[in-house]
Curated annotation (Swiss-Prot):
UniProt-recorded name of the protein: Putative membrane protein insertion efficiency factor
A single Gene Ontology CC term: plasma membrane
Biological function: Could be involved in insertion of integral membrane proteins into the membrane.
Highest taxon listed in the record's lineage: Bacteria
Membrane spanning stretches: none
Pfam families: YidD
Species per Swiss-Prot/TrEMBL record: Streptomyces coelicolor (strain ATCC BAA-471 / A3(2) / M145)
Main location: membrane
Lineage: Bacteria, Bacillati, Actinomycetota, Actinomycetes, Kitasatosporales
Length: 124
């Protein structure tokens, strides 16, 4: 359902929006906001955010900058992740298994890749 809605917004942006000109008081425009909201949050929540934005875009509104809110991780997702960690024995992705290696390669070890790479190298 997400992609047909995104296609409708793109169709509007390519056909109707150029005829109307820049009339939106907000940045990004309502159609760009809607596209981003549906792409980021999905069809249901993105459509609700877009409808609320269009309702706010009226002659009595001052306008301004109004970005799409970031996607939040749902509470049930955090509970599921905690249960999964407890089942696996408490290891998490933040604590990688080192298998006898030091967690941070020291620059004193000449065989480590960190000793060969300059601290100002790209990607370091």
């Amino acid at each position: 359902m997400k992609y047909p809605l995104l296609a409708l917004i793109k169709l509007y942006q390519w056909t109707i929006s150029p005829l109307l000109g820049p009339v939106c008081k907000y940045y990004p425009s309502c159609s760009h906001y809607g596209y981003t909201a549906i792409d980021r949050h999905g069809a249901v929540k993105g459509t609700a955010l877009t409808a609320w934005r269009i309702l706010r875009c009226n002659p009595w509104s001052l306008g301004g900058v109004d970005h799409v809110p970031p996607r939040k991780r749902p509470r049930w997702h955090e509970m599921l992740r905690a249960a999964w960690r407890a089942r696996k024995g408490g290891t998490s992705a933040a604590e990688p298994a080192t298998e006898g290696r030091p967690a941070h390669p020291s620059s004193s070890d000449p065989s480590s890749p960190a000793a060969e790479t300059s601290p100002h190298a790209q990607g370091a």
